[in-house]
Amino acid sequence: DGASIFSANCASCHMGGKNVVNAAKTLKKEDLVKYGKDSVEAIVTQVTKGMGAMPAFGGRLSAEDIEAVANYVLAQAEKGW
């Protein structure tokens, strides 16, 4: 499920919706909206292809796993992490 995939692959940089590399670009709802990452499609693209300091996970995770993570991130952002 999205939570366990997130814990295993994303939490080292994004624990609690934060961003240890770029503190301005968190996974909190207001930042997702600000940077146009507030949809499943946008998050799937970011996770699959990577960008800047964030590595691409397209070769490591299946499309289904990436979509599960995207849905998890959006759900957590809605709840305020």
Swiss-Prot record:
PROSITE patterns in the cross-refs: CYTC
Post-translational modification: Binds 1 heme c group covalently per subunit.
GO molecular-function terms, A-Z: electron transfer activity; heme binding; iron ion binding
Family matches, as InterPro entries: Cyt_c-like_dom (IPR009056), Cyt_c-like_dom_sf (IPR036909), Cyt_C6 (IPR023655), Cyt_C_IC (IPR008168)
Residues annotated as binding heme c: 10, 13-14, 54
Keywords: Electron transport, Heme, Iron, Metal-binding, Photosynthesis, Thylakoid, Transport
SUPFAM superfamilies: Cytochrome c
Subcellular location, principal: other
Statement: the UniProt record of this protein carries the keyword Ribonucleoprotein: no
Cellular compartments annotated: Cellular thylakoid lumen
Function according to Swiss-Prot or TrEMBL: Functions as an electron carrier between membrane-bound cytochrome b6-f and photosystem I in oxygenic photosynthesis.
Quaternary structure and partners: Monomer.
Family the UniProt entry places it in: Belongs to the cytochrome c family. PetJ subfamily.
NCBIfam families: Cytc6PetJCyano (NF045930)
Name of the featured protein: Cytochrome c6
Organism listed in the record: Microcystis aeruginosa
